[in-house]
């Protein structure tokens, strides 16, 4: 009986120590899983009824992505974000800005960044931006 108690105590101690050192694994509900997620201490971007979805002018595929995102947000929140074509380098606030970035390694890769003023979704291609939207 004493050996059984010692074995149970040793097992409980091992489990307690293991649970103290185990890292929590995030459960992101996106496919494919992001390769990297970085958190900052900045205030979050707050979606509101005046949010704008911007995309580069003369890019019909990103315009279609912007319209898709607008419809998605409207279904989820009842906000109806307007979409707007913007010139290269034009700055907008309270916006979700879609764009292309040829430095992204994967053709279907994307980088999503948030600030208190807005969200940027950049992809190497329009498909990458679409995956970032999802």
PLM segments and residue spans:
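Bacterial Sec-dependent N-terminal signal peptides
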Residues: 1-29
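Contiguous, structured surface segment used for ligand recognition
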Residues: 20-134
């Amino acid at each position: 009986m004493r050996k059984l108690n010692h074995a149970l105590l040793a097992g409980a101690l091992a489990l307690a120590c293991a649970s103290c050192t185990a890292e929590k694994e995030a459960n992101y509900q996106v496919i494919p899983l992001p390769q990297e997620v970085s958190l900052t201490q900045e205030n979050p971007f707050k979606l509101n009824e005046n949010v704008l979805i911007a995309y580069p002018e003369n890019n019909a595929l990103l315009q279609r992505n912007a319209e898709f995102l607008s419809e998605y947000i409207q279904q989820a929140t009842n906000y109806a974000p307007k979409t707007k074509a913007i010139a290269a380098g034009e700055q907008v606030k309270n916006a979700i800005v879609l764009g292309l970035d040829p430095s992204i390694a994967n053709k279907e890769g994307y980088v999503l960044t948030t600030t208190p003023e807005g969200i940027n979704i950049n992809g190497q291609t329009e498909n990458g931006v679409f995956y970032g939207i999802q």
